Amino acid sequence: MTSDCSSTHCSPESCGTASGCAPASSCSVETACLPGTCATSRCQTPSFLSRSRGLTGCLLPCYFTGSCNSPCLVGNCAWCEDGVFTSNEKETMQFLNDRLASYLEKVRSLEETNAELESRIQEQCEQDIPMVCPDYQRYFNTIEDLQQKILCTKAENSRLAVQLDNCKLATDDFKSKYESELSLRQLLEADISSLHGILEELTLCKSDLEAHVESLKEDLLCLKKNHEEEVNLLREQLGDRLSVELDTAPTLDLNRVLDEMRCQCETVLANNRREAEEWLAVQTEELNQQQLSSAEQLQGCQMEILELKRTASALEIELQAQQSLTESLECTVAETEAQYSSQLAQIQCLIDNLENQLAEIRCDLERQNQEYQVLLDVKARLEGEINTYWGLLDSEDSRLSCSPCSTTCTSSNTCEPCSAYVICTVENCCL
């Protein structure tokens, strides 16, 4: 709303002092003119021309706001009778005119400032290059591939860890079996050692019995020899001189008895020897079989232990390879995260700058809104003053209604280079 109205021109051609009516007086009002040029593209009819004022006698001065709401005050024309306007009322109207002119000047300057700001904002918006978000899809694809590889590696590590645990459990089982077999072998070796001691004792007993039998045989031979010698000696002493026959029980055959005893002893010894040899052979065979089975089991356990050791070594090597691969992938992920973190920091900085600019724009908008509210308050206050002005005019209308003046008013609204104008002619204005 740009407006700068020219000064109000009141041109009284004549104001007589006779008792009759004075010559006609005209007041020309021009509104909605730019400063210095007096030309505008807007020609508006004053908003308050629709108000009908029934006046009898002299017509009051005309007020036209136009596009700039600038009233035309004919206060300097001496056409009123008996001092209708007092000095205080004239000063009040002059003060209101000054306030309205300053208000219109302020509105015009604010509109120019707003137009300048709008042009600057439009230029800035045209100069701003829209930020194009870079395409990070290939980086996202690379990250997804690396994440899939990491997940596969973790699954493989878990599987290898499970296999390693199973191998450790199998190794522990075989170790416990080996220890049990070793303890059983030691027990069998202890039994064999004890059986060897028993066999040696039996062999010693056998040799003792054989020596005892030999000594008994020698004693028997000595007894037989002594008996024969004694019998022969007695026979030689007696000779044929004495023949004594005794009716006694038959004598025992000592040789037969000794032979029987020897046979019994030899039979017992043979049975004992055979039983001992058979028992020893059975025990030895069992021990040999147990030893062979234990040796086979021990060899199998040793082979399994060697195989498990080789498997554990291979798994350890594979685990180290997987760990190195995992470390390299983690380093790659860390580098990627650092790169994207730096890019994200740059984007965040850009976002912060844009947010700061947006905050500044919002502050400017709030400030302009506050200024607009202040202007609205000023407008409301000025409207109140204008209403007061109208009240004063109405009071003057009521006071002038009794004046014996006849007034004619001709108005003309035309759209010309200098804007709308209205000509008021006051005729027969009496002093």
Curated annotation (Swiss-Prot):
Protein's UniProt keywords contain ATP-binding: no
Region (Coil 1A): 90-124
Sites annotated Stutter: A338
Alphabetically ordered keywords of this record: Coiled coil, Intermediate filament, Keratin
Tissues expressed in: Expressed in skin and scalp. Also very weakly expressed in tongue, breast, colon and small intestine. In the hair follicle, it is specifically present in the upper hair cuticle. Not present in the upper cortex (at protein level).
Region (Tail): 397-431
GO terms for cellular component: cytoskeleton; cytosol; intermediate filament
Domain IF rod: 89-400
A Pfam family that the UniProt record links to this protein: Filament
UniProt xrefs under InterPro entries: IF_rod_dom, Keratin_I
GO biological process, one term: epithelial cell differentiation
Gene Ontology molecular function, alphabetical: structural molecule activity
Renumbered residue ranges of the record's region Linker 1: 125-135
Renumbered residue ranges of the record's region Head: 1-89
Region (Linker 12): 237-252
Region named Coil 2: 253-396
Region listing for Coil 1B, in residue ranges: 136-236
Miscellaneous remark of the record: There are two types of cytoskeletal and microfibrillar keratin, I (acidic) and II (neutral to basic) (40-55 and 56-70 kDa, respectively).
Family: Belongs to the intermediate filament family.
Subunit: Heterotetramer of two type I and two type II keratins.
Role, per record: May play a role in late hair differentiation.
Annotated protein name in UniProt: Keratin, type I cytoskeletal 40
Native source organism of the sequence: Homo sapiens
Gene from which the chain derives: KRT40
